[in-house]
């Protein structure tokens, strides 16, 4: 009988895409690997990215459904780029959790199919990196604007995490206090102090950090349609508010990594120099959270244009920052990302830093 229609349609479709094989040979064109970009800016004149967030649990970025095999390869790509620090952004968000927490399961959270925290600790150990744990986010702060709700759940979570992973893995290197704020948020100073103190007490003084945003003109609701807003914070107001926050938290928070994507590229130096001055004043490390996704696009969120990332990292170097981390490698810079342009960003980055 005649072959089914699909069997006939498949080679026709492949032909139309220019991918049909002739005698088993792939006819797709291949890039000439001997060609490099001709950079007209100085190579590597920027602070290199040495840390990345791991976006588990995601807030507003689609999941890639990786298993341990894919994560293992991603850690190898990170290592090749010079990353020595991986930070789980939050160990749970509302009812989704990354590890089988007895406390959170009792509270009605959903059972995960794998223990991501155990896997991240093992992979960090395997590739000579330090793993930092992001605290649980109940979602109540986002709903109410009051940070103090987050303290209660994390009392139990911090103890669980230390017993299950921190005391067991040498790769467990620190804590990320995951509440994101930008200005004088209700309960923030007290909450950061309380959670930071508990993290340090349980772990024998391991370091802690926060990653707030700057309330700049691109600090708009990710679910809304606008890319910018009228009422952006002034440098003076930013300095005043963060001076007060650092004054209140510096004993229990070792580093601050401001998200760098909410201000314009010609404002970077002004804000960055204030951040560095304040961090120095309070004996804190000044990191930058170099966002590798693009806030200037109408699509939320895709990998950033290389020159934008370059300018942000150049500014961090000019202002004497201590470390650059990114949000986040696996979606926006990884050669195996669901987004094709992420691997190209990786290539441009490696080319710029002469790591090809």
Model-derived features: positions:
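Aromatic-lined carbohydrate-recognition surfaces of secreted/lumenal glycan-active proteins
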Residues: 131-152, 176-179, 185, 195-238, ...
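An active-site-proximal structural segment forming one wall of the substrate-binding cleft
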Residues: 111-127, 146-173, 198, 238-249, ...
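Boundary/entry segment of secreted carbohydrate-active catalytic domains
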Residues: 24, 28-84, 89-92, 228, ...
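Aromatic-lined substrate-binding rim segments of carbohydrate-active enzymes
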Residues: 68-139, 188-209, 270-278
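Substrate-binding cleft of secreted/luminal carbohydrate-active enzymes
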Residues: 86, 257-265, 284-356
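Active-site cleft segment of glycoside hydrolase catalytic domains centered on the general acid/base Glu
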Residues: 141-172, 177-205, 210-212, 222, ...
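N-terminal export signals
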Residues: 1-20
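Surface-exposed, active-site-proximal loop segments in enzymatic domains
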Residues: 62, 94-112, 139-150, 300-301, ...
């Amino acid at each position: 009988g005649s072959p089914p229609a699909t069997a006939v349609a498949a080679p026709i479709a492949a032909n139309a895409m220019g991918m049909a094989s002739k005698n088993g040979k792939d006819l797709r064109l291949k890039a000439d690997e001997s060609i490099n970009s001709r950079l007209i800016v100085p190579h590597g004149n920027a602070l290199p990215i040495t840390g990345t967030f791991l976006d588990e649990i995601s807030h507003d970025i689609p999941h890639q459904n990786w298993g341990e095999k894919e994560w293992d390869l991603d850690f190898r790509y990170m290592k090749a780029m010079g990353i020595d620090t991986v930070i789980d952004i939050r160990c749970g968000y509302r009812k989704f959790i990354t590890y089988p927490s007895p406390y959170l399961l009792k509270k009605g959270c959903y059972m995960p199919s794998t223990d991501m925290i155990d896997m991240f600790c093992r992979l960090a150990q395997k590739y000579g990196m330090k793993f930092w744990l992001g605290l649980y986010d109940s979602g109540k702060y986002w709903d109410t604007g009051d940070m103090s709700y987050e303290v209660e759940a994390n009392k139990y979570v911090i103890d669980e995490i230390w017993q299950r992973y921190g005391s067991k893995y040498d790769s467990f290197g620190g804590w990320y206090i995951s509440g994101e704020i930008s200005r004088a948020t209700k309960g923030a100073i007290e909450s950061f102090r309380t959670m930071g103190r508990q993290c340090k007490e349980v772990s024998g003084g391991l370091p802690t950090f926060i990653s707030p945003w700057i309330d700049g003109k691109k600090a708009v609701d990710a679910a809304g349609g606008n890319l910018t807003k009228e009422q952006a914070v002034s440098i003076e107001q930013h300095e005043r508010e963060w001076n007060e926050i650092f004054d209140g938290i510096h004993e229990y928070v070792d580093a601050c990594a401001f998200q760098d994507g909410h201000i314009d590229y010609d404002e970077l130096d002004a804000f960055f120099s204030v951040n560095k001055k304040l961090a120095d004043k309070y004996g804190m490390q000044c990191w930058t959270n170099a966002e590798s996704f693009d806030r200037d696009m109408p699509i939320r969120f895709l990998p950033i244009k290389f020159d934008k990332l370059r300018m942000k990292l150049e500014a961090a170097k000019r202002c004497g920052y201590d470390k650059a981390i990114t949000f986040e490698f696996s979606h926006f810079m990884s050669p195996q990302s669901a987004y094709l342009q992420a691997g190209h960003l990786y290539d441009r980055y490696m080319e710029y830093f002469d790591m090809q």
